[in-house]
Amino acid sequence: MLSLIDRLAAERRLTLEEYEALVAGQSGEAARYAAALADRTRRAVYGVDVYIRGLIEVGNVCRNDCLYCGIRRSNASCDRYALDEETILACCAEGYELGFRTFVLQGGEGATPVGRVCRVVSRIRAAYPDCAITLSLGEYPADDYRRMYEAGANRYLLRHETADRAHYEKLHPHEMSFENRMRCLRDLKAIGFQTGCGFMVGSPCQTARTLAKDLKFIEAFQPDMCGVGPFIPHHATPFRDFPAGSAGQTLYLLSLIRLIRPNILLPATTALGSVSPDGRERALRAGANVIMPNLSPCAERSKYSLYDNKLATGRESAQNLALLREAVAAVGYRVVTARGDVKNP
């Protein structure tokens, strides 16, 4: 197993069967070895810098009915909200004062017409020309993505969720299309966005083979960012009784992704911190180099509930940057306030 990890670190690619063997053969020794190589790899590209992004959860209205998600359309108990433009701008103003130079606007799909997205992006771009603007608002036609890019957005996060069509269809309702999700990712990259994909670890019906396909997809697609976190069930979804994904497997996969794509921007996700008290710090040691503290209005944060028991210790809040800096420094890294664009390999 260690020889496969060595070859991945050297060549940045494996066969699908070799990826499957790596996933299925995970052990404590393999995970520690992969993490050490991943940490060395990220230090060679990014040093000990950890980039922070100010996350603004702009609304939890969603047209989709994904079987794993707490803000799915069918959840009648979800307390819906949508931030107005002035509130979003106020969040950015607070974030800028705190030192953030990237804002991430994330929300349910289909709730924000492209014209409104472009208007908000244009206003943020005019107010903060030195900042990066990341959007994570789901699937749109290519022309809409182009308008967002021309309005001033730099990055777009759209998790592919799984690179296996049959698995995708088990996680999503029939009106959602695996082909369309992949089309969106290709469009985003072609338009010029720094493009991010991602997936859950431990989702229902996931296998070593489907995870191997995720790794092979990342190898082929070469994303600039990749969001990976454990599946965590939400009580108001069809997957409420499934077990959560494992922190250990998530960390191992983060390390493998860093070896596949040395210059990738790899978040230590809130979901990982939610299943393991020191999950985000462990993620940094396993190859992650991005953290996204929450800039959303405090009154709305609990409403953006994608999964149960979302981390709420304080360190995930943008207002507690001092705590975050201390936690990151304690494991040997440094929070920086740069835009943190992807570096050329």
Briefly describe each language-model feature range:
Residues 1-29, 96, 219-345:
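Auxiliary Fe-S-binding modules of radical SAM enzymes
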Residues 11, 38, 66, 158, ...:
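Conserved, mostly hydrophobic/aromatic
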Residues 46-87:
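Canonical Radical SAM [4Fe-4S] cluster-binding loop centered on the CxxxCxxC motif
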Residues 53-56, 76, 104-115, 166, ...:
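Glycine-rich, proline-tolerant flexible connector loops at the mouths of alpha/beta enzymes
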Residues 59-60, 109-113, 174, 202-207, ...:
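Short, small-residue-enriched loops and turns at beta-alpha junctions
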Residues 73-89, 95-116, 120-185, 194-201, ...:
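Core AdoMet radical
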Residues 113-137, 177-194, 242-264, 316-328:
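Alpha-helix-loop-beta-strand connector modules within alpha/beta enzyme cores
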Residues 141-148, 204-218, 274-285:
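Catalytic cores of alpha/beta
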